[in-house]
Amino acid sequence: MIKLSGRAKPIGLPGLVDPGVWRVCQASETPTEHPLAYLVRDGDDHVPGYGLYLTQGPDVAVPGPALQLPADLAHLAAGDVIGVAPDGRRITVLWKQAATHNSVLLTEQCDNYCLMCSQPPKDRDDAWLFDRAKQIVSLLPSSARSLGLTGGEPTLHADALIDLLEHCRDTTPWLQLHLLSNGRRFADAGFATRYAQVGLADIMVGIPLYAPEAGLHDFIVQAQGAFDETVRGILNLASLGQCVEIRIVVQLHTVPVLTDLALFIARNLPFVDQVALMGLEMTGLARPNSAEVWIDPANYQRELLEATQILVTAGVATRIYNHQLCVLDERLWPYAVRSISDWKNDYLDICQMCSVRDACGGVFTTSGNRLSQQLRPIPP
């Protein structure tokens, strides 16, 4: 687990920090028109020409305005993209070069209100997040390979989303994108067509589907009519040749219908590019709703195995996210993916002696103590 934000100490700032998004660099990268924040190391504290300097200590002489980094951000490295508060007193890591997973928040608004949502919706104007996302994309190093676009529900801001995707196409055409959406806006054939016409080379939309029928799905997402719109959205995207991933969060309501949902997908949506069966992150709305959603993963292994076998037999690529190998049926290990983002990923003390630790995805630090009671080290 790593910290992604911390308090900085401004040194010699002439005023407010502008712009608010910077790429961290070192001596191998010469100053350009891009906002580059030079990460000062021992012996190179007099490199001139950069708009901002990042230091590890208070007594470093630099030829320009500087921010002294907190100890929690000592992991910053060249290529990372950071956000800096206008007064220079807070730094947030927005994209990390060494991270396995990077994602950009586009909005906290949503037209679903899922019982287990890890990012509870907020009804406020956050259109500035799309502008920041464009700045982040513009600063990504050429070594960047993938980026997640998440919310909230990004498609609520249709024009801003299309504009961002066009910016990605024109600025980082090699980048693999993964857009999280509830899929409902894609039921509008006109919007689905606009999305497809952007012409991105490598983008997938991850869309949740929680039941094989409207009643339960709409209850889980707390939005009447959502099931029909989501399914029509998936169909529209597929008809336009767009990549779609169906995401199923395995929780107390979905476990009893998991095999039926797998059959529904196998029979009606077998063309999707991937299905992700996802362990529950016990944060956000999942905490106050824990009695409604929590189930120990050890108690649904039969259903998870049956659902996986149904999907695989139908030729649907299947992945299992956010599960620990010691809890999974060993027949499911080939489908398990290390999927938890670095900043909220950790291992328990008992994991240190586990023979498969390096292949295991670990646990959510955000889930607190709400973890399976069957976690254990696997002997050699």
What are the language-model segments listed below?
Residues 147, 202-206, 228-291, 299-323:
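Conserved C-terminal portion of the radical SAM core fold
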Residues 136-155, 321, 375-380:
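Short Fe-S-cluster ligation motifs
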Residues 159-166, 187-197, 256-264:
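Distinct, well-ordered alpha-helical segments
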Residues 2-15, 329-380:
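Flexible mid-to-C-terminal extensions adjoining Fe-S/redox cofactors in radical SAM and related proteins
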Residues 1-100, 303-304, 310-318:
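Flexible, acidic/Gly-rich N-terminal and inter-domain linker regions that tether
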Residues 192-210, 262-277, 336-361:
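Structural recognition of alpha->loop->beta junctions
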Residues 118-131, 142-157, 169-189, 199-231, ...:
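Core AdoMet radical
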Residues 95-131:
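Canonical Radical SAM [4Fe-4S] cluster-binding loop centered on the CxxxCxxC motif
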